Amino acid sequence: MAKKVAAQIKLQLPAGKATPAPPVGPALGQHGVNIMEFCKRFNAETADKAGMILPVVITVYEDKSFTFIIKTPPASFLLKKAAGIESGSSEPKRKIVGKVTRKQIEEIAKIKMPDLNANDLEAAMRIIEGTARSMGIEVVD
């Protein structure tokens, strides 16, 4: 018999640095999950990806046990890293804050492929290019 799902929690956490402080503590605490156990397991699994922000989907079951799936870093995070900028443009399409090459877009698309709703690399690249444009990052050849 499969366990009954009580809740699904989505968080974006720095790799290897989950702590019981907000936002982790309150999000998991209200569902009765052992917060320290989650933090230890998450940090152990993401220790090799230091410096990245990773989305995680935590499934909490009725018996207070949990499982979690770690997704690929957000496209915006990868684009900011590739362009070497702190944050996106305050006025996208008017104010360009950085540049990325097609090669960098392809690399990001390859990393994001498992989480994107795209059939091939071309479609994935177009999705990432759109994200770049909406952040005020210019795509150059």
Curated annotation (Swiss-Prot):
<comment type="subunit">
    <text>Part of the ribosomal stalk of the 50S ribosomal subunit. Interacts with L10 and the large rRNA to form the base of the stalk. L10 forms an elongated spine to which L12 dimers bind in a sequential fashion forming a multimeric L10(L12)X complex.</text>
</comment>
<keyword id="KW-0488">Methylation</keyword>
<dbReference type="GO" id="GO:0006412">
    <property type="term" value="P:translation"/>
</dbReference>
<comment type="similarity">
    <text>Belongs to the universal ribosomal protein uL11 family.</text>
</comment>
<dbReference type="InterPro" id="IPR020784">
    <property type="entry name" value="Ribosomal_uL11_N"/>
</dbReference>
<dbReference type="Pfam" id="PF00298">
    <property type="entry name" value="Ribosomal_L11"/>
</dbReference>
<dbReference type="InterPro" id="IPR006519">
    <property type="entry name" value="Ribosomal_uL11_bac-typ"/>
</dbReference>
<dbReference type="Pfam" id="PF03946">
    <property type="entry name" value="Ribosomal_L11_N"/>
</dbReference>
<comment type="function">
    <text>Forms part of the ribosomal stalk which helps the ribosome interact with GTP-bound translation factors.</text>
</comment>
<dbReference type="InterPro" id="IPR020785">
    <property type="entry name" value="Ribosomal_uL11_CS"/>
</dbReference>
<dbReference type="InterPro" id="IPR036796">
    <property type="entry name" value="Ribosomal_uL11_N_sf"/>
</dbReference>
<dbReference type="GO" id="GO:0003735">
    <property type="term" value="F:structural constituent of ribosome"/>
</dbReference>
<keyword id="KW-0687">Ribonucleoprotein</keyword>
<dbReference type="InterPro" id="IPR020783">
    <property type="entry name" value="Ribosomal_uL11_C"/>
</dbReference>
<keyword id="KW-0699">rRNA-binding</keyword>
<dbReference type="GO" id="GO:0022625">
    <property type="term" value="C:cytosolic large ribosomal subunit"/>
</dbReference>
<keyword id="KW-0689">Ribosomal protein</keyword>
<protein>
    <recommendedName>
        <fullName>Large ribosomal subunit protein uL11</fullName>
    </recommendedName>
</protein>
<dbReference type="GO" id="GO:0070180">
    <property type="term" value="F:large ribosomal subunit rRNA binding"/>
</dbReference>
<dbReference type="InterPro" id="IPR036769">
    <property type="entry name" value="Ribosomal_uL11_C_sf"/>
</dbReference>
<dbReference type="InterPro" id="IPR000911">
    <property type="entry name" value="Ribosomal_uL11"/>
</dbReference>
<keyword id="KW-0694">RNA-binding</keyword>
